[in-house]
């Protein structure tokens, strides 16, 4: 699993039929210090994540084990919305503090 921040959505009007109705998110990867990396990933949204939320996502074969993704050609799926992240007992991110 990896941590990313939702930076936007990706819309595709023409796609593989099994992907119809799937919401795609543009994720910016986050490093161990909580800083954004210059790397992005498009992921199917499995949890209803919104703009600027920090999320957990899985890639590769793990992404295809998520319910509903088994028969879809996905490489990445958002599997959780993060509430808090701590490193060495220090808070790194808190969803409730995000909008202060």
UniProtKB/Swiss-Prot annotation:
Coiled coil: none annotated. Residues 1-83 form the BMV domain. It is found in: Carboxysome. Keywords: Bacterial microcompartment, Carbon dioxide fixation, Carboxysome, Photosynthesis. Pfam families: EutN_CcmL (PF03319). It comes from the Bacteria. GO terms for molecular function: structural constituent of carboxysome shell. Its main location: other. HAMAP family: CcmL. Belongs to the CcmL/EutN family. CcmL subfamily. Homopentamer. Interacts with full-length CcmM. The tight homopentamer forms a pore with an opening of about 4 Angstroms in diameter which opens into a wider tunnel at the base of the truncated pyramid. The pore is positively charged. Probably forms vertices in the carboxysome, a polyhedral inclusion where RuBisCO (ribulose bisphosphate carboxylase, rbcL-rbcS) is sequestered. Has been modeled to induce curvature upon insertion into an otherwise flat hexagonal molecular layer of CcmK subunits. PANTHER family: BACTERIAL MICROCOMPARTMENT SHELL VERTEX PROTEIN EUTN, ETHANOLAMINE UTILIZATION PROTEIN EUTN. This is Carboxysome shell vertex protein CcmL. The gene is ccmL.
